Regions:
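Conserved alpha-helical positions within TPR/SEL1-like repeat arrays
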Residues: 6-24, 53-68, 100-118, 147-162, ...
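Ankyrin-repeat and related helical/solenoid repeat scaffolds used for protein-protein interactions
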Residues: 271-339
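Flexible helix-coil transition and linker loops at the boundaries of alpha-helical arrays
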Residues: 1-8, 43-55, 90-102, 137-149, ...
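Defense-system signaling and execution modules centered on TIR/cGAS-STING-like, death/scaffold domains
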Residues: 18, 22-26, 34-37, 72, ...
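Eukaryotic tandem repeat interaction scaffolds
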Residues: 205, 225-232, 236, 241-260, ...
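Glycine-centered coil turns and helix-coil junctions that link the paired helices
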Residues: 15, 21-26, 48, 62, ...
Length: 354
């Protein structure tokens, strides 16, 4: 560093890029942390006053590394540091002079604000995410950069879906549906199968939540169709968690569809979907998600009992709700337990009247 500081800083920056790539590939937090340290070292030489473009490049790279570290941490400190790094980079990388770097920083900033908003349930952060993704699309025009254009719409859809949940405003779900459908204009199953499937899954999830406000059976059927489309690509072997989440979503939509139409004809399909998730969401590996699936299966049997299933269905419902309660306790997630207790009491009261 003393003899050739500029070259030393360049090597540190390049080392950081290599470590980020390796750390993400190996899901290795330690390597990504080392990358962040390498970028910080480079920034000791690459100051804004002396080397503004190199400084902005290393700040952008540091933001990328910190966003990778943040995947392993459930707090907000690392995310805030990453956002500050991207904001710094944007003071040099203007749209007029460095359009691609500017768009990349805007897109990455949108992802950071999305995660911050999700973790804090802060609508203002999610609105910042929306603004950043929309800004990126000023450069990522469909004609020149079709896949980047589609990516920005997919990311926007994810943020708008979260914003709908945080604000309880269904219009955001409608906006998210439009965003996902725009992404699907470029994401084709034949050419971009994984992104196509993830977008279908996002669309299915958003349509499910939209149906909660409009009680429209067609919206639920569209949700189920989108998630089933996603499962054509997202298999249990290649994407187990995505596969299980899609199965869970199908089960929830089928259950709700039966409630809207006042019929039990969808219960068998819903039960099969919830049961399928247990191949991935085991009690040992993911106790909280396992508990939610136990709760969902309890709802299936409770519904079946109300459609004439009799005493055995009530008893199965109680057993599944008890399992769910135990799973939530083991996971240290106590919020759903009072509601689960209420369900158990109600089922027992109904059973006593039989």
């Amino acid at each position: 560093r003393q003899k050739t500081p500029v070259e030393w800083a360049m090597v540190q920056n390049n080392l950081g890029n290599t470590l980020v790539t390796l750390g993400i590939q190996l899901n290795d937090k330690a390597r990504i942390n080392q990358a962040a340290d390498a970028f910080r070292a480079a920034l000791e030489v690459r100051t804004r006053d002396t080397f503004p473009v190199s400084w902005a490049t290393s700040r952008l790279n540091l933001g990328n590394a910190l966003s990778g570290v943040a995947r392993f941490d459930m707090g907000t400190g690392t995310l805030e540091e990453a956002a500050a790094a991207y904001d710094d980079a944007l003071t040099v990388f203007t749209r007029q002079r460095f359009s691609m770097d500017w768009a990349s920083a805007q897109n990455n900033l949108g992802s950071i604000y999305q995660t911050l908003g999700q973790r804090t349930r802060d609508a203002s952060r999610l609105e910042q995410s929306v603004a950043a993704f929309q800004a990126a699309r000023q450069v990522y025009v469909r004609r020149k950069f079709p896949l980047d254009w589609a990516m920005s719409y997919y990311n926007l859809g994810n943020t708008l879906q979260l914003l709908g949940g945080v604000t309880d405003k269904p219009e955001h779900y409608g906006e998210a549906v439009d965003a996902y459908r725009n992404a699907l204009r470029e994401y084709q199953r034949e050419t971009n199968p994984r992104q196509w499937a993830l977008t279908q899954a996002g669309l299915g999830s958003t349509l499910h939540w939209l149906s909660m406000s409009n009680a429209d059976p067609k919206t639920l059927r569209d949700s189920i169709a989108a998630r089933r489309a996603a499962l054509e690509v997202l298999t249990i072997e290649t994407a187990p968690v995505d596969w299980a989440n899609a199965q869970n979503g199908i089960g929830m939509s089928l259950l709700n569809l039966g409630n809207i139409e006042r019929t039990g004809k969808y219960l068998d399909e819903a039960e099969a979907a919830f049961t399928a998730t247990l191949k991935v969401f085991t009690r040992e590996s993911q106790p909280m998600q396992w508990a939610f699936e136990q709760n969902n299966l309890g709802d299936i049997h409770w519904n079946r009992a109300s459609y004439g299933g009799g005493k055995p269905e009530y008893l199965k419902a109680i057993a599944f709700f008890e399992n769910a309660k135990q799973g939530f306790t083991e996971a240290g997630y106590t919020i759903p337990i009072p509601l689960t207790d209420q369900k158990i009491d109600l089922v027992k009261q109904q059973l006593a009247k039989k």
